[in-house]
Every structure is written in structure tokens, then in C-alpha cells.
Regions:
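Short cysteine-rich clusters marking metal-coordination/redox-active sites
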Residues: 3-6, 15-18
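Active-site-facing substrate-recognition patch
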Residues: 16-83, 118-148, 186-193
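Short glycine-rich phosphate-binding loop at a beta-alpha junction
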Residues: 80-93, 152-153
Length: 193
């Protein structure tokens, strides 16, 4: 087997060196329109080769490994005083798995409960590599399939323009559901607060 990051021999998903490097993140925050805070673990350029595996079979293993190094650690120091639901954006299964559902699963604790297949995009348009104008004119058109009981944390893999997260927040707030913040693996823009 090989390390998914550096391709050196490794029995685990990441070799010892890469695992240490990926564990050494500093949680960043980016503020979107309307005040939505998006917390992220990595800069997009640092892990884009790993993120691009999300539509491949082996991406399943990479996303589990990344979630163990980031989202699972987040839940260890984030101790909410109340119950919270986690919603993964558009967690439909593409191929064999949903990469956003994998990330959401790793946030589960006594007080944090992921709920799956809750917020689904009616539009199947892919945003990867598209312009801001394209993204604004081709919305996700989310549909709320389940009503969460508690305030919500939104989960996605990447924040680029933030339009998907803002659209998700809008539909939830229209249904009187409080959105606390969003949590993503990577930030693809460097206008952080």
C-alpha cells in the first residue's frame, strides 16, 4: 500500500510523516455574507489532490482518514452546552459513498447528532472550476427533506465562494432552523478574518 499524500510505502492511509503534517492544522475561520462563520482545517491548495478523489472509489478511504485527523478532533474540543444537529450538504451517494456524510459522521458525540439525507440539491450542476457568475445563476435549489430538532452545524468539503452554504442557511432559516456555523475541510479563498 502507499500513502495517499506522498505515495511512499505505508500500511495506513497516510505515512507517519504525512499524518503528522495533516494533524498539524490550525483551525481557520472565514466570515461569509450575513455573518455565517465557516471554520476550516486546511487551505485548499495544500490538500486539493486529496479532495479531488471524492468521486473516485479510493476517495472513500481518503475522506475517512482526513475526517479522523480533523472533524473527529474538532468534536473533542467543541463541547456544546445543548444538543446540536449536523447536516451535510447534499449527502446523496455518488458512486459508492457520500463524502459529506463521511465528514458529518465524525462529529457525532453525546450532544452532536448528524442527520443524513436532510438537505438535498434539486440541481445536479457541478460547481468545480466554474465562475462566480455561473454559480450565482445556477443555484443548488436545496430541498429540506427532514426537519432538525436542534440548532444546526452545516458540513461540506470545500468553501469557495460560500454560495452553497449561504443557500443552505437561507432555506433552513426560512423553516425557523437556527444555523450556528459551518465546518469544512478546506478554504479555497484567502480572505479570512
Amino acid at each position: 500500500m502507499r500513502c495517499y499524500n506522498c505515495y511512499k510505502f505505508s500500511l495506513a492511509s497516510f505515512c507517519t510523516h504525512c499524518k503528522e503534517e495533516l494533524q498539524d492544522y490550525s483551525l481557520g475561520v472565514r466570515k461569509l455574507e450575513g455573518g455565517l462563520k465557516v471554520y476550516y482545517f486546511y487551505h485548499y491548495d495544500d490538500i486539493k489532490h486529496l479532495l479531488h478523489t471524492k468521486h473516485r472509489f479510493y476517495g472513500y478511504f481518503i475522506f475517512h482518514a482526513l475526517a479522523r485527523l480533523s472533524f473527529a478532533k474538532f468534536r473533542n474540543f467543541f463541547n456544546p452546552p445543548c444538543f446540536i444537529n449536523v447536516i451535510a450538504l447534499d449527502d446523496k451517494t455518488y458512486g459508492d459513498y457520500s463524502h459529506t456524510a463521511i465528514l458529518a459522521k465524525y462529529l457525532k458525540t453525546k450532544f452532536i447528532k448528524p442527520i443524513f439525507y436532510t438537505l438535498q440539491a434539486k440541481s445536479q450542476v457541478k460547481y468545480s472550476g466554474k465562475s462566480l457568475h455561473f454559480r450565482k445563476t445556477n443555484k443548488r435549489s436545496y430541498e429540506l427533506k427532514k426537519i432538525p430538532k436542534y440548532p444546526v452545524i452545516l458540513v461540506d468539503d470545500i468553501v469557495t465562494t460560500g454560495l452553497s452554504l449561504l443557500e443552505a442557511k437561507e432555506i433552513l432559516e426560512k423553516n425557523n432552523i437556527e444555523v450556528l456555523f459551518a465546518l469544512v475541510l478546506a478554504n479555497a479563498k484567502f480572505d479570512t478574518i
